[in-house]
Amino acid sequence: MNKCEITALFDQWNSALKTGDPKQVAALYAADAILLPTVSNQVRHNHAEIEDYFVHFLAKGPQGVINESNVRIFGDIAINSGVYTFTFKDGVSVQARFTYVYRWDGLGWLITEHHSSAMPE
């Protein structure tokens, strides 16, 4: 696995957002994943909670673009952190910091930790 392949995992996630299907997005997360989302104060601890978050988030029609990416790989764990910008169907854009922690499960890379927080004003 190399940095380009880890960066491409964001493209996979962003493509899942474009489907508008929260189940497809949640499927990219490990069963025991933790999501600290951008536009919710509730920490999500499992697929049901993660899927619930994306039901509401996807209704806004988000499209993400990475502005800065920093990838580190530690065997079967990879981390991608940086800054991304989401543009919503109403034209509003939000820039946020992100961290994705991925774990190789023998079949593919799954998100085990995802933290996203809006940039401070």
Listing of model-derived features with the role each one plays in the protein:
Residues 1-24, 34-121:
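A beta-strand edge to alpha-helix "cap/lid" segment located at domain peripheries
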